[in-house]
Amino acid sequence: MMKKPVVIGLAVVVLAAVVAGGYWWYQSRQDNGLTLYGNVDIRTVNLSFRVGGRVESLAVDEGDAIKAGQVLGELDHKPYEIALMQAKAGVSVAQAQYDLMLAGYRDEEIAQAAAAVKQAQAAYDYAQNFYNRQQGLWKSRTISANDLENARSSRDQAQATLKSAQDKLRQYRSGNREQDIAQAKASLEQAQAQLAQAELNLQDSTLVAPSDGTLLTRAVEPGTVLNEGGTVFTVSLTRPVWVRAYVDERNLDQAQPGRKVLLYTDGRPNKPYHGQIGFVSPTAEFTPKTVETPDLRTDLVYRLRIVVTDADDALRQGMPVTVQFGDEAGHE
């Protein structure tokens, strides 16, 4: 009779263990079965010419798929081609001037400068002698004071001409000053920078797709005169595909960067996409109005960016997505 209470007690213990184990299993399944709700991120970019001008041609229309590097449109190139020719000519002139500064003066130029000094010296000697004679005549009252002043003026002018010729000869023999050479070099560098800018402007008069995408809007037509930066196209970027979702603080530890998840859409309830958490916002925010959640209470959440690793054309921007965490998704 004593065995019956013992058996009953053991049964109670076993039952309690089973219940506890079942509860633990259920909780672990709940933790591994976190479900979030989000949307495929809408990623658009406005494309424009960096320079202004008249639109010459547009190669794509709304709805067209575009590829990175594809030519989408062109401005009238003529003004930029002319500017490029002018810039090239400016570089040629500046280069020639700089080369002259480096080379210095030729022997022929030095010889001509020396001859000019001799000629100026002879003119000065004559003017000085004439002035000396005029001084003697003025003292004897043979000439007027005005005649003496004219002789002095001629002597001073000849002296100034001689000094100028001597300075020029000295410069020719010593070569150009370092300051003059540096100035010529700076002028050349400025002309080269203007040439680089002209080349860039001509290049930017052609609009090229920065990445793959789909053309959403075409804002202008050929013949339109645009200011620099005016929007020409709006493009939806197709790669990479991101899903934006939000997780509350209680489940934040499950949503770590690198965690793999499964992504379900209404059109593919039994064939999930695969994704990986690439970014978790460092700051909390109130649940956005666009987020669909099982409970509608206001909560502080953290934004997630999930990179879809096997996206196809069926996964459209803005499409609602169910994000499933679980053992089958796994970790990085």
UniProtKB/Swiss-Prot annotation:
Main location: periplasm
Pfam family, one: HlyD_D23
Compartments reported by the entry: Periplasm
Superkingdom, taxonomy of origin: Bacteria
Recorded GO CC terms: periplasmic space
Coiled-coil spans in chain: 108-211
Signal peptide span: 1-16
Keyword Coiled coil annotated: yes
Keywords: Coiled coil, Periplasm, Signal
InterPro entries documented for this protein: CusB_D23, UPF0194_membrane_YbhG, UPF0194_transport
Family: Belongs to the UPF0194 family.
UniProt name for this protein: UPF0194 membrane protein YbhG
Organism per entry: Escherichia coli O6:H1 (strain CFT073 / ATCC 700928 / UPEC)
Gene transcribed to yield this protein: ybhG
